[in-house]
Amino acid sequence: MKLHELKYTEGSKKDVTRVGRGMASGKGKTSTRGHKGQNSRSGGGVRVGFEGGQTPLYRRLPKIGFTSPNQKEYVILNLSDLERLNLALIDHKVLVEQKIIKNEKQLVKVLGKGSITSAINVKLNKVSKSAQAEIEKLGGKVEVI
């Protein structure tokens, strides 16, 4: 089979319905818009969320929550990610060199998903209890900075 021999699967491509192209087409005159009314006019129709004058749902429901401006964003790393690095010491400097984080100001949290096979020393912002237990079990050290 060659590229010029490829064909679409039967029924996978539908022809575009051409409206307003004469009465014989079956889609002429009103062009599937019906007779008169707001929706038949050019530019007609109502805005999104309009419910005919009834107070719309988005105004009936109360406002809720907010986004805290003081929220800290952490880059999440799992033990399996640290294992792939295959290094004895893991800190911000190493992660920047390995292009895992963009700069040393980024906050990093280590989670316990996966496992490690050798002792590693970790100097990062946050470490979960399960990750800390796994690291210390193999003789590694965890330092939260």
Curated annotation (Swiss-Prot):
Organism domain of life: Bacteria
Residue stretches spanning the membrane: none
Compositional bias (Basic and acidic residues): 1-18
PROSITE patterns named among the record's database cross-references: RIBOSOMAL_L15
Keyword Mitochondrion: no
Biological processes per GO annotation: translation
UniProt keyword list: Ribonucleoprotein, Ribosomal protein, RNA-binding, rRNA-binding
Region (Disordered): 1-51
GO cellular component, one term: large ribosomal subunit
GO molecular function, one term: structural constituent of ribosome
Gene3D superfamilies listed in its UniProt record: 3.100.10.10
Composition bias, Gly residues: 42-51
InterPro entries: Ribosomal_uL15 (IPR030878), Ribosomal_uL15/eL18 (IPR021131), Ribosomal_uL15/eL18_sf (IPR036227), Ribosomal_uL15_bac-type (IPR005749), Ribosomal_uL15_CS (IPR001196)
PANTHER family: 50S RIBOSOMAL PROTEIN L15, LARGE RIBOSOMAL SUBUNIT PROTEIN UL15M
Assembly notes: Part of the 50S ribosomal subunit.
Family of this protein: Belongs to the universal ribosomal protein uL15 family.
Protein's recorded name: Large ribosomal subunit protein uL15
Gene behind the chain: rplO
